[in-house]
Amino acid sequence: MMRTVIALGWLVAVTLSPTAASAWGYQGHRVVGAIADRLLTPAAKAQVQQILNEGDTRGIDLRKAAPWLDCVKSVVRHDDGRFHYEVDPDHLEYEVPCTPFNAARERARMVDYVGRNWSTCSYTPDGFERGCHNTFHFADVAIQRDSFDRNFQGTNPHDLVATISAAIAVLQGKPIPPPFPFSIKDKKEALLLLAHLMGDLHQPLHIGSVYLDPDGRLVDPDVAHKIEPETETIGGNAIQDGVAVSFQTLNLHHEWDDIPTDLGDAATSELVDAAKAVPPSPGLPEAWPVAWATDTLLVAHDAFKGLGFKPTSPPAQNKWIVTFDNHMDYLQTSDAIKRKQLAKGGARLAELLNAIWQ
C-alpha cells in the first residue's frame, strides 16, 4: 500500500525537547503505580507506606509517588550554580501531579536530588548542559537489535536500566553496582525513582529507537560501533507529523506517552486482571531490569512496524516526518500495546518490591 503522511491529531501538543520526554505522562505513571498498589503483599505494602510517608508526606502510595521523577524537572539551575524549584506560571497544569510534594521539605528534597545528580555525567542534547539526571529515563537501543546488551550503542552507565539497578541495590541495602554515576541518598529516594522508572521501562520508545539517514532510511549504529549525531531521533522525539498546533510540534514519542483516555489515572479492573496474568520473572531481581528491557525492546519493534520516515520540507537536520502504511490499524495496535505495557509495568513494580520485602 502506498504510504501517506497522516496528521497525528490525537497527539499531545508539546515542543521538541530531549529533556521533555515523560513516559506515559503523569496519568500513565499513576496507572502503573496504582496497579502495583493493588498487587503488593502485606509486608511490601507496609514497607512502601513507611518509606514514602516519612517526613512531611502523608497518604502517599505508589500511585501518587510515581510522577515524582518528572516533578523534579521543575528544578532549574541558574547561572550562579544554584538550583531552585520553579513553577511555570504558563503551565500550572504541570503541578497537578506534584501537589503531594508541595511541602517545603519535599521541595528541598527535589532540589537536593537534582543538584547531586546534575554533573555526575554530562548531558548536552542541544549543546547546553541539561543535567545527568535527565538521562536516567531512557536508553536508545536500535530496533535492529533483539535484546538489551551493554555492548550495544544507545546504552550507557547512567541509562534507564542502570538507574533501576542502582535503585534496587539501595532498597536492598547493598552498594550501587559500578560504574555508579548516581547519588541516591536513601530508600525513599530509591523508591520514588523505581515508582517512576518502572513505567518508563515499559514505554517502548524509552528503550528502542530508530536511527535515520537524511532521507529517512534506517541506519544501524552498531555496524559502525558509534552513533552519528545526525542520525539520532531521540527515541522518536525528532520524528514529526508535519502539523503545528498553537506553534508547537507534534512528535511520535509523545504520542506513545499519551495513554488511552478511558483509563484515567487509576487502575481499572481490566488492567489489574491483565497485570495478574503477567508471568513471574525468572532468576534473581538483580537480573530483572535487563530482561524487562529486552522484552520492551521487542515491543518497540511492533511500535515502529508499519511506519516510514521522510525528511521534513524544507529539510532540517535531525528532523523527519512519519508516514503510515495504515493509520487506523496503527492506532488500534498502539492502543493495545499501551494497555499491555501499563499492566506489565504495574505487575513488575509490585513483583520487584514483593521480592525485596519478602
Residues of each region from the PLM?
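Bacterial N-terminal signal peptides that target proteins for export
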Residues: 1-9
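N-terminal, motif-rich segments that launch catalysis or mediate targeting to/interaction with membranes
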Residues: 22-195, 204-358
